[in-house]
Every structure is written in structure tokens, then in C-alpha cells.
């Protein structure tokens, strides 16, 4: 059996990795490696038990590949927050009404857990080398019920074609007449100088709506979500986030802002499966900006589906329809709004 993977990020390389582990001949076309030099955060503090389970699984996979650094995680929430998902998943946490220098209101709490810094660029680059990924970009072609790749004008056939190209998934599939249930959006973040006691914390503020992560010294990286696909951060974005940080920590000095492109799904979480119109096309996407947290676990399930024809906890792909890609299942904010 031969498999061809389109996409060289977390979803693509880990799907290829698990296929290779199962004895499948795999070729991969990854394009340019786009991950930042800074580590990405894996958190276990999420409202959906499915995401917590996959994050735990992904963490164990990462630990076999690189040194993982723990970091204190602080989630700021209203006192009525339901932490049942953490209890059911066995995640250790503390509930406090004060923490270091954070400024909290009377009806707010902090939930302290442990996050993990994942050197994702190093891991992905290493897997691309080990698996022989090409830096070339691939397009999809179709004849009857079979899909093939087109690379530099050359046709590449495979028994299984796996589309794992992130925000490019939908555009690539549309070229063969398939509308996938994914939509791209821009995710914004900015770099800051902050008080020393804050810089080492991974923070999710679900009252003021911002998050922050340790960046390369002496930077702190923070943001508040997403906007229209392929758009730059709005004017004054970094200053706006700095004001939110300052309300908690006293001060923050904004330096610059950047945007990236993420991909959402109708469920607000990751999706993977077989595209029913074709006999050999599979897709993994909708990682919604948290591919570093659950990507390897979802990729393992998709590889199992390709090899065995079935997989645990992998629902069928829904039909495509319009939805708000900014609704992220892993974000406590949306759970709290329903409370």
C-alpha cells in the first residue's frame, strides 16, 4: 500500500509517521516549513473531555521525540465556572482567589494547572527529514472515483491520498469539486515586555478575553483570537492587548503584532476522515489553532482509519455549510457563555 500526504505541518507529518509505523510506504509533500521558532503550548485545561484526552495522548507522543518543558498555567475564570471536564479527565488543578501579582475581582478565581512547551518546529522538521518529505507543493487531481497528486506537472498516484494542508485544505479540494467542512481564519498575536513574574506563566483570561504564553526571552506572546481570513492585525491591536494585560499585571509594553492563518470546523474542533465521494481521499483539518495540543492524537486515529478501515472516536465528516470558524471548542470562553 502506498500513501501520499499533502501538507508538512503537525497533521501531515504525524499522519505520515503513524502510517510509516504501520508499514505503509509514504511520500509527503510539505511545502515551506512555517512554524515559529518559539515553542508552542500544550494545555490540558480545556472544557471538552475529548480534547483533554487527545492532549494527554499527544503529550506522551511528543515526550518520545523531544525534551518537553513544563510551565505553570493560570486560567482566570468567573467563580461559577464548571471544571467537571478536568475532574473527569484526572487533570490536577488548584482553585485560588489570588496568585502572585494578578489583579482579580471578587467574583473571579484562578485555576492553576501545568502546561507544556512543545518545540514544535524542531519536532516537525525532524520528522520531515526522517520521512523524506519534499518541500515541493502538491495539487489534487481526480479521475472517476480516484484522486491523485500533481507535483511539478507530474502525476503521483497512491492508494490513499491524505489532505493535511491546514488552511489550504478547502481551496485544494475545491479544485476537484469537493467542498470540505473547513473554513480559514486569521489568528492574531503580539509580542510584549511584561513584569518578570508574569513572563513565565501561560495565562488564559476568560473574563477579559486574552491569552499569553512565554516567548523567547525577554518576550511575552499574547493575543485574543481571530478575524477575517488572510487579514493583518487591526490597527492598534498590540496596544489593545497591552491594556488588557495591564489590567491584570500593572503594565505591558507592546512591541509588534503578527497574524497567521488557522482553520476551523463546524464542531469547533478537529475533524478527520474519508471523503465519501472518492475511494482513496482522506482529510485531517479543523485543528483550530490548537494542532500542537491534539494534532498527533488525531493523526494517529486517521492513520488507523487508512490502514484498518475503521478508527476509535473518529466521527464521519459532516457536510459543508457556513459557520463561524472563530468558535473554538478548546476555549473556555464558549463553554462559560453557555453556563
Tell me what each language-model feature is.
Residues 38-104:
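Dinucleotide-binding Rossmann-like beta1-alpha1 core, especially the glycine-rich loop
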Residues 132-148:
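A conserved short coil-to-beta-strand element within the FAD-binding core of flavoproteins
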